[in-house]
C-alpha cells in the first residue's frame, strides 16, 4: 500500500463500499467514474459529501472508492459510512465531531422479509366480512 493512504469500509442495506483517502485536491472517484457521473441524484451526492463538509476537508483529500450491491441510496449511505471510518483513521480527533453528526453508527435497518399469506412484509390481503 502507498504511504499516507487511509482506508475505511462502509455498509448500508445491501451495499458495501471500500474507501481510500489520501491528501490531494478534492477529487472523488467512484468505480472509475466521477461523483457527478456516478450519482445522478443531487441528494446522493450531498450524502457522500456530508462527512467531508463537516470536518472542512472537501478540497484537502482525494477519495478513491469502490462500491458494490444495493441501490442508489444504499450505496450513498455505504460510501458516507466508509468515508467516516477512513477520516477517523486519518485523524482520531475527528471522531467526536463525526459521532455527534451521527455518521459513525452503522445504520442497521434492513428490508423486512415478505411473509407467507401476506402481500408484502406486513400488508394483509383485503378483508371481506361477507
Swiss-Prot record:
GO terms for molecular function: RNA binding; structural constituent of ribosome. Residues 116-130 have a biased composition (Basic residues). Disulfide bonds: none annotated. Residues 111-130 are annotated as: Disordered. The keyword Ribonucleoprotein applies. It comes from the Bacteria. One of its GO terms (biological process) is translation. InterPro entries: Ribosomal_Su5_D2-typ_SF (IPR020568), Ribosomal_uS9 (IPR000754), Ribosomal_uS9_bac/plastid (IPR023035), Ribosomal_uS9_CS (IPR020574), Ribsml_uS5_D2-typ_fold_subgr (IPR014721). Signal peptide: none annotated. Keywords: Ribonucleoprotein, Ribosomal protein. GO terms for cellular component: cytosolic small ribosomal subunit. Belongs to the universal ribosomal protein uS9 family. HAMAP family: Ribosomal_uS9_B. This is Small ribosomal subunit protein uS9. It comes from Enterobacter sp. (strain 638). The gene is rpsI.
Amino acid at each position: 500500500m502507498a504511504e499516507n493512504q487511509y482506508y475505511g469500509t462502509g455498509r448500508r442495506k445491501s451495499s458495501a463500499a471500500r474507501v481510500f483517502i489520501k491528501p490531494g485536491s478534492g477529487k472523488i472517484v467512484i468505480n472509475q467514474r466521477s461523483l457527478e457521473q456516478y450519482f445522478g441524484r443531487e441528494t446522493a451526492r450531498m450524502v457522500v459529501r456530508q462527512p467531508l463538509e463537516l470536518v472542512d476537508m472537501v478540497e484537502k483529500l482525494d477519495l478513491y472508492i469502490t462500491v458494490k450491491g444495493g441501490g442508489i441510496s444504499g450505496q450513498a449511505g455505504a460510501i458516507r459510512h466508509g468515508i467516516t471510518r477512513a477520516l477517523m483513521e486519518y485523524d482520531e480527533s475527528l471522531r467526536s465531531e463525526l459521532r455527534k453528526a451521527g455518521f459513525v453508527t452503522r445504520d442497521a435497518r434492513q428490508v423486512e422479509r415478505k411473509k407467507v399469506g401476506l402481500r408484502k412484509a406486513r400488508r394483509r390481503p383485503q378483508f371481506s366480512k361477507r
